[in-house]
Curated annotation (Swiss-Prot):
It comes from Azorhizobium caulinodans (strain ATCC 43989 / DSM 5975 / JCM 20966 / LMG 6465 / NBRC 14845 / NCIMB 13405 / ORS 571). The gene is purL. It holds the Pfam family AIRS_C. Part of the phosphoribosylformylglycinamidine synthase complex involved in the purines biosynthetic pathway. Catalyzes the ATP-dependent conversion of formylglycinamide ribonucleotide (FGAR) and glutamine to yield formylglycinamidine ribonucleotide (FGAM) and glutamate. The FGAM synthase complex is composed of three subunits. PurQ produces an ammonia molecule by converting glutamine to glutamate. PurL transfers the ammonia molecule to FGAR to form FGAM in an ATP-dependent manner. This is Phosphoribosylformylglycinamidine synthase subunit PurL. Mg(2+) 2 binds at residues 117, 268. Its EC number is 6.3.5.3. It catalyses: N(2)-formyl-N(1)-(5-phospho-beta-D-ribosyl)glycinamide + L-glutamine + ATP + H2O = 2-formamido-N(1)-(5-O-phospho-beta-D-ribosyl)acetamidine + L-glutamate + ADP + phosphate + H(+). Monomer. Part of the FGAM synthase complex composed of 1 PurL, 1 PurQ and 2 PurS subunits. ATP binds at residues 52, 91, 493, 530.
Amino acid sequence: MIPNTPSITPELVAEHGLKPDEYQRFVELIGREPTITELGIVSAMWNEHCSYKSSKVWLRTLPTKGPRVIQGPGENAGVVDIGDGLAVVFKMESHNHPSFIEPYQGAGTGVGGILRDVFTMGARPIAALNALRFGDPHHPRTRRLLAGVVAGIGGYGNSFGVPTVGGSVGFHERYNGNILVNAMAVGLAKTDEIFYAAAAGVGRSIVYLGSKTGRDGIHGATMASAEFGADAEEKRPTVQVGDPFAEKLLLEACLEIMQAGCVVAIQDMGAAGLTCSAVEMGAKGDLGVELDLNAVPCRETGMTAYEMMLSESQERMLMVIADGKEDQAEAIFRKWGLDFAIIGKTTDTLRFVVKHDGDVKADLPIKELGDEAPEYYRPFTETPPRPVLGPSDVNHAVSVADALERLIASPDLCSKRWVWEQYDHLILGNTVQRPGGDAAVVRVNEGPKALALTTDVTPRYCEADPFEGGKQAVAEAWRNLTAVGATPIAVTDNLNFGNPEKPEIMGQFVGCVKGIGAACEALDFPVVSGNVSLYNETNGQGILPTPTIGGVGLIDDVEQSMTLAFKAAGEAIFVVGKTDGWLGSSAYLYTVCDREDGAPPPVDLVAEKRNGDFVRGLIKDDFITAAHDVSDGGLLVAIAEMAMAGRIGASVDGVPAGMPAHSFWFGEDQARYVVTLPANQAAEMVRRAEAAGVPVTKLGKTGGDKITLANERPIFVEGLRDRHDSWLPIYMGAN
C-alpha cells in the first residue's frame, strides 16, 4: 500500500485543474485514491497543454504526409527532406501564459524550449522566428509587455547563438489580458541521423542531463491550460527561469553524445518537466519506466517527489542510453560542465513507478497517462457568416493618399525594425534576407540551397470567418515563401484560441482547422508539427482566434532568391491576380474607418496555386526584378512597401470603371502579387500570363521620389518611410 498524505480533497483536485469526472476516471483507472505525487502527475499529463484532449480529434484531420516528410506530428519537431542527405527540422510552440505574467523570462524560455525541441531530434538550430500579439497600444500594460517580451527573445536567442530572422507583431484590444508569444525554431540534420523519443530495450539506463532541478515552473503546464482571472500577476512563481549559456552547452553535449552512438531515445524536459518526458518516452516505446528521485541533481534542498516531478526548470534532457555507453556519455557531459545522473531504468511492466527516500511515491499505468489520455469531442457552434460589404457600404471620408499614410504608420503595418534590431539576425553568417521582407532566407551550410521562413495569420479574418481565415493563414505563408523564390514544402502551426468549453470558441477552432487542412491539401503543404494553446481568456474575454502558420520553403539556388524592393527607375509594375476591391474585415476598414465588420476575402485555392506557381516560374527565369505578396492593406500598401524598400517612387493607375478608388487600392483580395520587370518585357509578361491562365494588370512604372496616383496629391517616398519607421520607436520611447 502506498502511503497517502495529504488526503485528496475536491478542492485539491480543482487546484490541479482536473474536472470531477476526470478525477473519477483516474480513480477508477488505478483502483484507489491517488497520492499527492500521482495527482500532480496526472494533472500534468491530462491537462490541455500536454494531452491535447480538446483538439486531438480535429488535429488528426490535417494533411501530414508528403514525399519529403520524414517525420510528421507526434515527435518533438517535424522533419522534412531537402535533398543532398539533409533534412530541415522545425516546430512552433507557444509560451503565452508565462510571457504575460513575466514577459522577459516567459519569452526567453519559450525560445529555449523550442530550440531544445529541434536539437533533441539531432538537428543543429540555424534560425529562430516568432509571432507576437499584444493588446491595444493605449492599454497601460502593453508597452511594458512588448518591451519585456522582445528583450527576452533577444536575450535568449542572441546568447544561445541562433539568428532570429523573421516574425510578425500585431496589436488588438482582445489581447489586452492574454498576449501571444509563438516561437519557432529551425534546424538542419542528416536524414539518416534523426533521433526520436520512443524508448527501446528493457533494463536500459535512463539518464538526466543538463542543469539542476529547482522549484521554478512547478505547475507551468497546468497554468497554461487555464483561463486568467484578476490574480494573473500572482502566478509569477510558475514561470521558468532560463539560462541560454547552459542551453548552448547542452546543445553541444547532446550533438556530441549522439555522434558517439550513445543515444537510444531522447526527450527534452519541457512542459510538466520530468513527468512528461519520462511518460512520453515509455509510452511511445511500449515500455515501463522506473525512476529513483534521490539521484536527481537538485539546486534546492528538501525538494519533494511532487516538486521534482513537476518542476519545469530549464535546459534539461532525459535520455535512454545504449547498453554499456554510460561511462562514455558521462565523460562527454562532464566535459561540457553539465550534470549527468542515472535516475532510472526501462522496464517491461508498462508501469510508471516513482521512488523517493525508499518509498514508492507513484505507481501508475504509463499508456493511460500518455497516448491514451482523455479525449473530448467538444460541442461547437459555427460562426455565423457576416454580410459581404459592397462598394456603397463603406463611406470613404479621407483621400487615398491620406489613407495610405495612416495605414503605413498604423501599429499593425508600421515597420517593426525597433523589434528585430534587438535580435541578432546575422549570427552564424548564413542570413541572406534579413527581417522586413516577405520571408527570411537562410543559406543551407555553404549553399547553393537556402531555406525561406515565415510566420503568418490574420486574426481579423479568423474572427469573421474561421474557415476562410484558416485557409488565408496558410495561403499567405505560401505566398510569402513564393515571393522570395522558394518552393513551399511544409508548415508548422500554433493554434491560439480561447476557452474550448464554450461552443462558439470551439467552433472557431474547428473552422480554422478545417480551413488550414483544405489549404494545405490544395497547396501540397503538409503540416509536420505544431502546438495548441487554449484557454487564452481573462475574466471571460477571449483572444481573437489566432492560428499562426510557420511556413518553410526551399530555394535551389540562393542567387535566385527574390526581394520586394524596387530595383530601378522606368520598370513596369504589374499586379498578378484578380482585383475585386474586397474591403470586408480589411486593415483599411479597421484603421481608417474604425470598423470591424464584413465578410473577409474568400480564398480561391486553385487561383492561389496557379498564380503562385506562375510567379515562382518568373523568378526562376530571371524575368522579374522584384516581387511582393499583397496582404494587409491591399495593393497600394504593397506598392508603398516596395517603394520604401528601394527608395524609388512609382506612377500607378488602373482603377477600373465603376470601382471606387479606395476599394481598388486597399481591398484585400487574395492570391495576388506585385511584380516589376524591365519595361520592354511588358508585352511578353502579358503573353506569359495569358498562356498560364493568370490574370495580370499593368499598373504603371517605377521612378522618381514619390508615388503618384490619378486625382490624388503625390506621396513622397521619404515622408512615407519616416511615418513607417517612426511609430514604434516613438511609442516605445513614450513614458
